[in-house]
């Protein structure tokens, strides 16, 4: 099967899939933000929860606080993930009520 170039500098998946919401083997286009995070939960069907940690400066206390933002992401069949993996995910059109990101690369092996 043909693997599309999605326009990002990421490693292509080795396996193939028939998922229509796959950016490589389906018709889903990615645009907008490209983020990196850690998989917290992969219990949903073809979906996962990815968390990103960032530091926010609080002027009143003159300190930085660590915040966590969770994203619901679509997992194509050609990318295998498990909780604890670091992944790169990109913004796409809305696929469900809370899912508007898709995993494009597994960063660590």
Swiss-Prot record:
Coiled-coil features, chain-numbered ranges: none
Keywords, alphabetical: Ribonucleoprotein, Ribosomal protein, RNA-binding, rRNA-binding
Pfam families per UniProt: Ribosomal_S17
Gene Ontology cellular-component annotations: cytosolic small ribosomal subunit
Function description: One of the primary rRNA binding proteins, it binds specifically to the 5'-end of 16S ribosomal RNA.
Quaternary structure annotation from Swiss-Prot or TrEMBL: Part of the 30S ribosomal subunit.
PANTHER family, per database record: 40S RIBOSOMAL PROTEIN S11 FAMILY MEMBER, 40S RIBOSOMAL PROTEIN S11-RELATED
Protein name: Small ribosomal subunit protein uS17
Natural source organism: Thermoplasma acidophilum (strain ATCC 25905 / DSM 1728 / JCM 9062 / NBRC 15155 / AMRC-C165)
Gene expressing this chain: rps17
